[in-house]
């Protein structure tokens, strides 16, 4: 969330930013409402001043045993007017807050300007995609042929975009999760969490999923929301708190299932594990001061890269352009892993610095010598587990339909080094 003072002082800049972000938030409506609010506030203050002066005059008249009925009657009308204007102020404030909550974060100056992913900037590549001497299969064909991924029964249980993992696939998914958490906690200093999978609306509002993306979230009958990422829960751990600067940065990680309606993705990735309503993810979250957040973003990207490098999966790092940037992010790097069956790189991690945008929404601050400042929050996939399984199955596949287990995962698989019939 942006500060109102900042919004008032940067209307034209924000109009340009919103255009570059493909956002249709109406800044002219904000300017009109803000101007109206100032008018109403001024009128309320004048009326309250008049009422206060009249109260003193009434007291003097009564002291002098003089009639004050005409003033009392007039002040009754003034009080009614003040009450009406206060109600109007509440209505105006709600409209301003709605605009404020729907304005995306201001992007970092280094962000490429462009309407869509075609304008993203490739930063670097790692690894060389393997050349197969046979036609590489898709992960869903490999999984179904081996009997370890069952999309038909997943759909029978829950509908489209659900899958049933069986045997080696279930074990490998668990191995991937444990491997990722071990690297992040034992080597990189993250503290592991197991968080709730359902949260209050105000928690989703804090990280920016609400109100803008409500249609993409699952809501329970008692107004709780299933988390679409554990970024939501971990970033909100310290909501409405003031931390000591010496405590920062905080490094948090968690595995969780994630639940997404995938609204607006009709027809995209309808087969396989790439786009599901329920999937597993290991998430990284950092809470930092304002000075160190961009250094911490680079470290977070490196943390995600470490997983891919240990798994020996070819990938590239791209910086997202203005039109492809997430709502709460000021700067984002995506990691895209190579998928042989698609002959292209696909997103497997997104690492973002949200600066003070989320912290301002959730009231998360840290102490400084002359008061307090809003924390900066960062989040990143470390990694999306199902997509990691996809990349392993496709990049490690063999001509006979089996696929190898990456060396670093063999100990987590009890010594199993190949998945076959």
UniProtKB/Swiss-Prot annotation:
Gene Ontology biological process terms, A to Z: selenocysteine biosynthetic process; seryl-tRNA aminoacylation
Cellular component GO terms held in the UniProt record: cytoplasm
Sites where the protein binds L-serine: 229-231, 283, 381
Listed pathway(s): Aminoacyl-tRNA biosynthesis; selenocysteinyl-tRNA(Sec) biosynthesis; L-seryl-tRNA(Sec) from L-serine and tRNA(Sec): step 1/1
EC number: 6.1.1.11
Database matches in SUPFAM superfamilies: Class II aaRS and biotin synthetases, tRNA-binding arm
Reactions catalysed: tRNA(Ser) + L-serine + ATP = L-seryl-tRNA(Ser) + AMP + diphosphate + H(+); tRNA(Sec) + L-serine + ATP = L-seryl-tRNA(Sec) + AMP + diphosphate + H(+)
Compartments (UniProt record): Cytoplasm
GO terms for MF: ATP binding; serine-tRNA ligase activity
Claim: Hydrolase is one of the keywords in the record: no
Enzyme class: ligase
Function: Catalyzes the attachment of serine to tRNA(Ser). Is also able to aminoacylate tRNA(Sec) with serine, to form the misacylated tRNA L-seryl-tRNA(Sec), which will be further converted into selenocysteinyl-tRNA(Sec).
Stated family: Belongs to the class-II aminoacyl-tRNA synthetase family. Type-1 seryl-tRNA synthetase subfamily.
Protein name: Serine--tRNA ligase
Name of the coding gene: serS
């Amino acid at each position: 969330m942006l500060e109102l003072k900042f919004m008032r002082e940067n209307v034209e800049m924000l109009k340009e930013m919103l255009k570059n972000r493909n956002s249709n938030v109406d800044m002219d409506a904000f300017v009109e409402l803000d101007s109206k609010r100032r008018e109403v506030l001024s009128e309320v203050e004048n009326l309250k001043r008049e009422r206060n002066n009249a109260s003193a005059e009434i007291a003097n008249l009564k002291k002098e045993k003089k009639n004050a009925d005409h003033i009392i009657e007039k002040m009754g009308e003034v009080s009614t007017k003040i009450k009406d204007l206060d109600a109007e102020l509440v209505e105006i404030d709600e409209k301003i807050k709605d605009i404020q909550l729907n304005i995306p974060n201001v992007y970092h100056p280094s962000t490429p300007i462009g309407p869509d992913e075609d304008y993203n900037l490739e930063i670097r590549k790692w690894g060389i995609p393997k050349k197969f001497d046979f036609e590489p299969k898709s992960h869903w064909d490999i999984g179904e042929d081996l009997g370890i991924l069952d999309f038909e029964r997943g759909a029978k249980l829950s509908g489209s975009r659900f899958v049933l993992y069986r045997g080696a696939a279930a074990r490998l998914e668990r191995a991937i999760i444990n491997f990722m958490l071990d690297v992040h906690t034992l080597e990189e200093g993250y503290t592991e969490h197991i968080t709730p999978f359902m949260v209050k609306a105000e928690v989703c509002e804090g990280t920016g999923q609400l109100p803008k993306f409500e249609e993409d979230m699952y809501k329970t009958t008692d107004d709780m929301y299933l988390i679409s990422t554990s970024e939501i829960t971990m970033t909100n751990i310290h909501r409405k708190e003031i931390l000591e600067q010496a405590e920062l940065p905080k490094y948090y990680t968690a595995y969780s299932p994630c639940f997404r309606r995938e609204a607006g993705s009709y027809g995209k990735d309808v087969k396989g594990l790439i786009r599901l309503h329920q999937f597993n993810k290991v998430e990284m979250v950092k809470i930092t001061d304002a000075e160190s957040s961009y250094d911490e973003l680079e470290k977070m990207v490196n943390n995600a890269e470490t997983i891919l490098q240990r798994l020996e999966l070819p990938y590239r790092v791209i910086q997202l352009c203005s039109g492809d940037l997430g709502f709460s992010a000021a700067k984002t790097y995506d990691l895209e892993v190579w998928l042989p069956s698609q002959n292209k790189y696909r997103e497997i991690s997104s690492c973002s610095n949200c600066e003070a945008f989320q912290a301002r929404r959730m009231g998360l601050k840290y102490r400084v010598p002359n008061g307090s400042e809003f924390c900066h929050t960062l989040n990143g996939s470390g990694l999306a587990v199902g997509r990691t399984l996809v990349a392993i199955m496709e990049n490690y596949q063999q001509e006979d339909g089996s696929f190898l287990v990456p060396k670093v995962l063999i100990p987590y698989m009890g010594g199993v080094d190949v998945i076959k019939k």
